[in-house]
Regions:
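Short basic/hydrophobic patches in alpha-helices and adjacent helix-turn junctions
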Residues: 234, 280-283, 325
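Active-site phosphate/pyrophosphate-binding segments
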Residues: 2-38, 131-133, 139-143, 147, ...
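Glycine-rich phosphate-binding loops that contact phosphosugars or nucleotide phosphates
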Residues: 33-176, 181-184, 218, 253-254, ...
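Short alpha-helical basic/polar micro-motif
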Residues: 105, 230, 321
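Short, well-ordered loop/turn and helix-capping segments at boundaries between secondary-structure elements
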Residues: 165, 238, 268, 287, ...
Length: 371
């Protein structure tokens, strides 16, 4: 299984998880219902944090409580006091992330309510918390995770829906409507797989140039922008930055010259401001893209299916994942520079046994998917 295979598998896995949605999140719903929690704090880094940022606004709307998303380092050093009376959810897809494990150790030492979410409940993370939950990824054997990102967004959304029902903030009719909205977002993700693949095929040469990239998005799509920048950086090995819309035009845009990659993710309801920014920048660099559910026929637009606004990251993520997977495969840019590789052990981010776990996942992938 290659990275692109997992990108294209995501909507299938999300669809399967939707069919068992109540069961999937039942334990976490029971936990938040049984405690006197006033807030939710998600502690995660990298792609898991970006997925949480994609779902944060949805969670706040559904649960009607404050939801914060912080890195493990920030949590341990600064962000552990407020919000008070919070349920802490620490996320590590691999279950081997040393920074997330350190955050869980802090929670345990300070008697803080904590749950770990992972795709591998037998990983070392299980030794550092009392409650470890599988969020439904199944098998993903590629380091540059994509399937796990969308599945985590979906899991958090489902937790918001059923948690909201348990807390009395969503009635039965609201649950049904929200599940339908999620189903439509998953279908939109499938559509965007094809849209993105066609886009890359049509723009292979310009996407293959080693130039900086800037990705812009607001709300849930800020999480998508974060993840897009990460994927472009780690796979194609280009400098990639992420910004909110107005932050972008308050200085960062001043570096743009012809040849830059600029991706602007439109607000779900359609933003005249973002559309105007994209129009302006298309006169500076021909590699400007406006990802929008409200296209007006301009050459730099890529159309996205309309979905419920707070679920917009679900179809938008796949566009960037597809670019990263296809261009990295074409350029064979998976490996880091030899000098960086030589010192990588000094910057290790995974607990002992991680490489063996990846090999085990590859064997499972061959068994599960026949690839």
């Amino acid at each position: 299984m290659k990275m692109l295979d997992y990108v294209q598998l995501a909507h299938v896995r999300m669809g399967a998880n939707l069919e068992r949605s109540s069961e999937l999140v039942a334990q976490l719903v029971d936990i938040i219902q049984s405690g006197s929690f006033d807030a939710l704090r998600i502690v995660a880094s990298g792609s898991s944090r970006h997925a949480a940022d994609c779902a944060r606004d949805y969670l706040q709307d559904a649960l009607q409580m404050q939801v914060s998303v912080v890195t493990p380092e920030a949590f341990v050093d600064f962000e552990h006091t407020y919000p008070q009376h919070a349920l802490n959810i620490a996320v590590s897809q691999s279950g081997y992330s040393t920074n997330t494990i350190a955050a869980l150790d802090y929670m345990r030492a300070h008697d803080m309510a904590a749950v770990a979410l992972t795709a591998n409940v037998e990983a070392p993370i299980k030794e550092h918390t009392d409650i470890v939950l599988d969020y439904g990824v199944g098998v993903e054997s590629v380091d540059f995770v994509t399937l796990g990102v969308e599945v985590l967004v979906e899991y958090l959304v489902l937790f918001g829906i059923y948690g909201g029902q348990a807390r009395g903030t969503i009635d039965a009719k609201g649950v049904a409507q929200r599940l339908d909205d999620l189903r439509e977002a998953i279908q939109a993700n499938a559509v965007m797989c094809k849209t993105a693949e066609a886009y890359v095929q049509d723009h292979m040469l310009e996407l293959s140039e080693h130039t900086p990239a800037m990705v812009v998005g607001n709300g849930p799509n800020y999480g998508a922008a974060e993840e897009a920048a990460l994927k472009l950086s780690e796979t194609i090995k280009i400098p990639a930055m992420h910004h909110e819309g107005e932050e972008f035009v308050h200085g960062p845009e001043m570096q743009i010259v012809p040849g830059y990659l600029v991706f602007i993710v439109d607000d779900p309801q359609g933003s005249e401001r973002l559309a105007n920014i994209a129009d302006a920048l298309s006169n500076v660099t021909t590699k400007t893209v406006l990802l929008t559910a409200h296209p007006k026929g301009r050459a730099h637009e890529v159309a996205v299916p309309q979905v419920a606004p707070l679920l917009s990251a679900i179809p938008n993520l796949v566009f960037f994942q597809t670019i990263a997977a296809m261009i990295a495969e074409r350029l064979k840019s998976w490996d880091v520079h030899p000098y960086l590789d030589a010192v990588s052990k000094q910057m290790e981010v995974k607990a002992e046994g991680y490489e063996e776990s990846v090999n085990a996942l590859k064997a499972k992938a061959a068994e599960c998917y026949g690839m």
